[in-house]
Curated annotation (Swiss-Prot):
Monomer. One of its GO terms (molecular function) is cysteine-tRNA ligase activity. Pfam families: CysS_C, DALR_2, tRNA-synt_1e. The keyword Membrane does not apply. Belongs to the class-I aminoacyl-tRNA synthetase family. This is Cysteine--tRNA ligase. GO terms for cellular component: cytosol.
Length: 460
């Protein structure tokens, strides 16, 4: 029984699809004016894992993730680069796909671009005007009447006035109310634009997603996801637009992944702690980055640092070491490990617990290597199968172990984790694994000193 934390209700709910056996999921994608940063990677990997597990449960999933390819930021960046908006967005879309493939993601079933749905956007704006939910201001821009939608604020469980108090709202004389937001912008000279009943212009950000999602998945669909910063105003505005236009409930389950913090601070260019995926992959194996992202439950915040990636590298090496020179059966009968892994994933896609199950499986696998070769090969197959649902352990073990190193040494947390594992291995009389860990630490310049009180270490 799959349970999903629904932002709309603020609690975990049993998942019940609108149509039995089928799931429609829309995730807000990137505005393609720059390279993907690690916050984008967190969202993309989270929903990739979610989509994998939904399919694993036997559902026919239609996973749609949009591309925002018309926006003020795109226009500004194209001007700075002295290139067309189309040239810029095509370059950034290609770069994003390259980054995702390196991170081990599978592509969504459909990636609609805003520029491909211009007529559908215009049609939805017109419906909102006809129903009295939108109006053309004195500036010529078209705005949504936020006060007319009685459920405005339901996603964030706040009243309109409260949300305005804590939000950055553009004060424009052309608007009837400070909370009203733009649906269609009048074009400025030289900007990319489209013809509409309200003159040459382009759509606002929020209406793009309403039009694309409802055209790709229908006016009422199962899951809508995105990053933590999209709850307000973007997703709140999507609900207001879509439900006003269609007269139906828009989405059943709203999912938001956690933020990525850098050295326990918010990631921002002004703080100088902003990292693109490409920055990170220049130093770390892509699978190490992926492991860091899935080692926490998708709603939890992740603290990104070189140290956290080094610890992720050590953990992933432990998994790959278990598969090194290990026969892998072609098929296997699921054991208690599969049961516990699935139980964790059914509990709001708890990848943190699922990953811990992989390490329990590895301990059993290492023990079986010296006791029962056939059992070891079956457990290795089960490990590969479960890890694939997280997008892990897809490389050849020897290749990964030879290519996962970075210039920095192991941090204290990573060293202690290995020492703790070695202590447990010795208690279990798994001396082969104990020796492996000692050798692994020695290769990193770490010397272990065993005594009655325990194990200490020094750097050689």
């Amino acid at each position: 029984m799959l349970k999903i934390y629904n932002t709309l209700s603020g609690k975990k709910e049993i998942f019940k699809p609108i149509e039995e056996g089928k799931v429609g999921m829309y995730v807000c994608g990137n505005t393609v004016y720059d390279f993907c940063h690690i916050g984008h990677a967190r969202a993309m990997i989270s929903f990739d894992v979610i989509s994998r597990f939904i399919r694993h449960l036997g559902y026919e999933l239609n996973y749609v993730r949009n591309i925002t390819d018309v926006d003020d930021k795109i226009i500004k960046r194209a001007e700075e680069n002295n290139e067309s908006t189309q040239s810029l967005t095509e370059r950034m879309i290609a770069a994003q796909r390259e980054d995702e493939l390196r991170l081990g993601n599978k592509m969504p079933d459909r990636e609609p671009k805003a520029t491909e749905f211009m007529q559908e956007i215009i049609d939805m704006v017109q419906v909102l005007i006809d129903k009295g939910f939108a109006y053309q201001g004195t500036s010529g821009d078209v705005y949504y009447r936020a006060t007319k939608f009685k459920d405005y604020g339901k996603l964030n469980n706040r009243k309109l006035e409260d949300m305005l108090a804590g939000a950055r709202i553009d004060v424009e004389v052309a608007k009837e109310h400070p909370a009203d937001f733009v649906l269609w912008k009048q074009a400025k000279a030289g900007e990319v634009s489209w013809s509409s009943p309200w003159g040459e212009g382009r759509p606002g950000w929020h209406i793009e997603c309403s039009a694309m999602s409802t055209n790709c998945l229908g006016s009422h669909f199962d899951i809508h996801g995105g990053g933590p910063d999209l709850k307000f105003p973007h997703h709140e505005n999507e609900i207001a637009q879509s439900e006003a236009a269609t007269g139906k409930e828009y989405v059943n389950y709203w999912m938001h992944c956690g933020a990525v913090r850098v050295n326990n601070e918010k990631m921002s260019k002004s703080l100088g702690n902003f990292f693109t995926v490409r920055d990170v992959l220049a130093k770390f194996n892509p699978e190490v980055v992926r492991y860091l992202m899935v080692s926490s439950q998708y709603r939890s915040a992740i603290d990104y640092s070189d140290q956290s990636l080094l610890e992720a590298k050590v953990a992933l090496e432990r998994l790959y070491t278990a598969l090194r020179q290990q026969q892998v059966a072609e098929s296997f009968e699921p054991t208690v490990f599969t049961e516990r892994f699935e139980e964790a994933m059914k509990d709001d896609f708890n990848t943190a617990v699922a990953v811990s199950v992989l390490f329990e499986l590895v301990r059993e696998l290492n023990k079986a290597k010296t006791e029962d070769a056939n059992k070891a090969s079956l457990l290795a197959a089960e490990l590969r199968s479960l890890a694939e649902l997280l997008g892990l352990l897809y490389q050849d073990p020897e290749y990964f172990l030879q290519n996962s190193t970075v210039s920095e040494g192991l941090g204290e947390v990573a060293i202690q984790a290995l020492i703790d594992e070695r202590t447990q291995a010795r208690k279990d009389k798994n001396f082969a694994r104990s020796d492996e860990i000692r050798d692994e630490l020695a290769s990193q310049g770490i010397e272990l000193l065993d005594s009655r009180e325990g194990t200490t270490w020094t750097r050689s």
